[in-house]
């Protein structure tokens, strides 16, 4: 830094002032790169304003209709990626935090829910952590929770919704496969058509492709797999049977539970075959009862997964709200400094 005394007049009358010394090259470099406090605050305001905008966009996607399409999922994923980028900028710019803000963010983001689904344990956070490290930790954990937790549930609900809609389409055809028997005490059922439709749906969702995989979420052009441990963790979290675990190449994926559909086919095989199988009322009622029980199992699974998705969405939303409050407070502090 400059030696101010070297540029001042002599403090004693009658004594010639000391000749100014030429600053060294390193001193010139220091003068050139150190921004003023005002410039630093101005940079903070820009970074904080951009982050605040991205947070609002992310919050808007969280409040939208639950994702049931690839387009909706892509929109939410993009909003989370942009939020992460803006948080990375805060980490690099070194936006300062108050002691209370530092502690609040550290305690909120040091143990994210995504750690529950990680094969390796999280390192315990240090007691003291710098503001830049806090922003970096927040950025990494927001990204991890968004992609590895909420993002998984978005994909699970989207795939299962498509699956259940396909099953509902089969149910809509049932009226055409049922007809009264000859004496009014029997019912004719087109077993072959019903069984063929259900078998086709089973075949579709037991194939491993981007449209049938629940976990891991599929993005990009290639197909992504996970380790066996990760896949098993998600099977447990989703409360699905072990049969949903499938090997794919060198990794594993989790598929839809087609067990209820297989039970339907088995029950149809048990009553016979044909395009107009005649059943007495008792036999038909017994078959219908079993069929509806499996239909209810499918519906319950979708409802359970949708509720789990809602919980994940709320968790992420709460974290974003904490982050939004901190950024808004920091932004106001930076603006007040410049106005003062």
Swiss-Prot record:
Pfam families (UniProt xref): T3SS_TC (PF06511)
Function field: Required for translocation of effector proteins via the type III secretion system SPI-1, which is essential for an efficient bacterial internalization. Probably acts by modulating the secretion of SipA, SipB, and SipC.
Record keywords, A-Z: Coiled coil, Secreted, Virulence
Induction line: Transcriptionally regulated by SicA and InvF. Also regulated by InvE.
Domain of life where this protein originates: Bacteria
Main location: secreted
Coiled coil: 291-319
Cellular localisation: Secreted
Record remark: domains: The N-terminal domain is an intra-molecular chaperone that prevents premature oligomerization of the residues on the coiled-coil region that are involved in interactions with the needle and/or itself. The residues in the C-terminal domain probably form oligomeric structures at the tip of the needle that are responsible for the regulation of secretion of other effectors.
Gene Ontology CC: one annotated term: extracellular region
Record protein name field: Cell invasion protein SipD
Organism this protein belongs to: Salmonella paratyphi A (strain ATCC 9150 / SARB42)
Family from the record: Belongs to the invasin protein D family.
Alphabetical list of Gene3D superfamilies matching this protein: IpaD-like
Region (Disordered): 1-26, 57-76
């Amino acid at each position: 830094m400059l030696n101010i005394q070297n540029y001042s007049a002599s403090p004693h009358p009658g004594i010639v002032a000391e000749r100014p010394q030429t600053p060294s090259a390193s001193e010139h470099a220091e003068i050139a790169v150190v921004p003023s406090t005002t410039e630093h605050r101005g940079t903070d305001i820009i970074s904080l304003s951009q982050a605040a905008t991205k947070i609002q966009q992310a919050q808007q996607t969280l409040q939208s209709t639950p994702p049931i399409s690839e387009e909706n999922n892509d929109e939410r994923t993009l909003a989370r990626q942009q939020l992460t980028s803006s948080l990375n900028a805060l980490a690099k710019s070194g936006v300062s935090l108050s002691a209370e803000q530092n502690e609040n963010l550290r305690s909120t983001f040091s143990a994210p829910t995504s750690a529950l689904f990680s094969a390796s344990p999280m390192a315990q956070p240090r007691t003291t952590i710098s503001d830049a490290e806090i922003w970096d930790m927040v950025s990494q954990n927001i990204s991890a929770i968004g992609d590895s937790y909420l993002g998984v549930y978005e994909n699970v609900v989207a795939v299962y919704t498509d699956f259940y809609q396909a099953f509902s389409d089969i149910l809509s055809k049932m009226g055409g496969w049922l007809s009264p028997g000859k004496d009014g005490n029997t019912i004719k059922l087109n077993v072959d058509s019903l069984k063929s439709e259900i078998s086709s749906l089973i075949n579709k969702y037991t194939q491993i492709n981007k449209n049938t995989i629940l976990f891991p979420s599929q993005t990009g052009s290639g197909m992504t797999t996970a380790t066996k441990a990760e896949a098993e963790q998600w099977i447990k979290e989703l409360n699905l049977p072990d049969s949903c675990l499938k090997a794919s190449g060198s990794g594993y994926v989790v598929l839809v539970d087609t067990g209820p559909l297989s039970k339907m086919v088995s029950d149809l095989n048990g009553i016979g075959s044909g395009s107009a199988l005649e059943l007495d009322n008792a036999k038909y009622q017994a078959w219908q009862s079993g069929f509806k029980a499996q239909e209810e199992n499918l519906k319950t699974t979708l409802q359970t997964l949708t509720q789990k998705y809602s919980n994940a969405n709320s968790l992420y939303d709460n974290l974003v709200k904490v982050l939004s409050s901190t950024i808004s407070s920091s932004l106001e502090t930076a603006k007040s400094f410049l106005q003062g």
